[in-house]
């Protein structure tokens, strides 16, 4: 509104005036649609320049809702096979590329025979989207990386309307995999892996330094066999980052799909953080492609042995609120990949 700044300054000259949330003292936001997650690490997600740099007021990535929510959005006949016209209508005219690029990335986990299978595989794509954005922010926090990143606002957390693109939770407030992988990426002490450099770093969000901590990395093949490992003692600065502590050297004969487990231990040997990744051997061939270890070559995940998990739970009440606390245990030596806990009532 013309004259708004002058009027506000006249009424209260002690307050600063911010005309909008982007392009006014901060750099522009976006993208919000699907890109190759490798571009987050490469810093090529936008044609308009660096994204995680300075203060970014708007940056995001999509995640498909759960199949239960998708069924609330449209008729079954349009859900599967995907009716592009209907999906695009429920995606702001195809704004987030859910029926195109997101679908292509999901198909890199193998073709789906049902909307249930597609929605499940699509959660892995959304998890990779969100986690890569946050861990790039971690790496570049306050100039510890190759950029100076002072802040990042994730746009947006949930769907304001019923649609085929969610974020951390959907229109029905159903959490997606993006929420849990965001929580992991933003834990106060966090060990993380860089898919572009193959390096391990540790991020600290505490106003306290930690000395003589140990970070470990283990690589497991598709048969859940440990094929590589390394550990190193580090000193972690207050509210800072220890970047590129060491490089993971993946064996040349490793299976096409494999897993990475990072752990961080304090001086008493207590585990204080852990992170899990899945990775393919596919080479990243540039920003105009959907290739790379985050993005393609995951079809072999279907060859993982099925695992029977053990579950136990307890219910309790605090005031007028009721809670269920569940514990999931994998009794086998096989990786139980991307397990979803669901309450059926």
Question: Which residues does each predicted region cover?
Answer:
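Short beta-strand elements of extracellular/lumenal beta-sandwich folds
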Residues: 197-202, 320-333
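Short acidic, flexible loop segments centered on an aromatic residue
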Residues: 206-224, 329-345
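Substrate-binding clefts and catalytic carboxylate motifs of secreted carbohydrate-active enzymes
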Residues: 42-213, 218
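Intrinsically disordered, low-complexity Pro/Gly/Ser/Thr-rich segments with frequent PxxP/GP/PP motifs
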Residues: 213-215, 221-255, 345
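Acidic/polar loop patches that form or flank catalytic/metal-binding clefts of enzymes
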Residues: 12-21, 151, 191-194, 228, ...
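Active-site neighborhood of glycoside hydrolase catalytic domains
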Residues: 1-27
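Terminal connector regions
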Residues: 248-299
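Edge strands and adjacent loops of beta-rich recognition modules
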Residues: 284-322
């Amino acid at each position: 509104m013309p004259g708004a700044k002058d009027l506000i300054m006249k009424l209260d000259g002690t307050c600063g005036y911010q005309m909008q949330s982007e392009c006014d003292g901060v750099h522009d936001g976006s993208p919000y649609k699907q890109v190759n997650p490798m571009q987050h690490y490469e810093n090529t997600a936008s044609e308009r320049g660096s994204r995680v740099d300075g203060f970014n007021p708007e940056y995001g990535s999509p995640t498909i809702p759960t199949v239960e929510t998708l069924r609330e959005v449209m008729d079954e006949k349009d859900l599967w096979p995907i009716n592009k016209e209907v999906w695009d209508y429920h995606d702001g005219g195809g704004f987030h590329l859910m029926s195109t690029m997101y679908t292509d990335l999901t198909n890199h986990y193998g073709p789906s025979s049902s909307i249930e299978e597609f929605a499940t595989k699509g959660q892995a794509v959304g998890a990779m989207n969100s986690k890569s954005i946050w861990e790039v922010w971690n790496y570049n926090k306050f100039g510890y990386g190759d950029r100076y990143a002072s802040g990042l606002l994730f746009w947006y957390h949930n769907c304001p309307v019923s649609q085929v693109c969610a974020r951390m939770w959907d229109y029905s407030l159903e959490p997606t995999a993006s929420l849990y992988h965001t929580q992991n990426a933003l834990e106060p002490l966090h060990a993380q892996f860089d898919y572009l450099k193959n390096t391990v770093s540790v991020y600290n969000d505490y106003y306290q330094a930690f000395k003589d901590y140990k970070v470990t990395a283990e690589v497991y093949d598709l048969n859940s066999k440990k094929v590589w490992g390394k550990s190193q003692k580090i000193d972690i600065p207050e509210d800072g980052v220890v970047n590129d502590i060491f490089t993971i050297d993946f064996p040349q004969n490793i299976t096409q799909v494999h897993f990475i487990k990072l752990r961080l231990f304090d001086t008493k040997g207590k585990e204080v953080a852990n992170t899990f990744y899945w990775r393919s051997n596919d080479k990243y061939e540039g920003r105009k492609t959907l290739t790379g270890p985050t993005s393609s070559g995951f079809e072999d995940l279907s060859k993982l042995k099925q695992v029977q998990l053990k579950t136990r739970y307890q219910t309790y009440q605090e005031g007028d609120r009721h809670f269920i606390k569940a514990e999931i245990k994998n009794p086998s030596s096989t990786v139980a990949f991307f397990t979803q806990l669901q309450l059926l009532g």
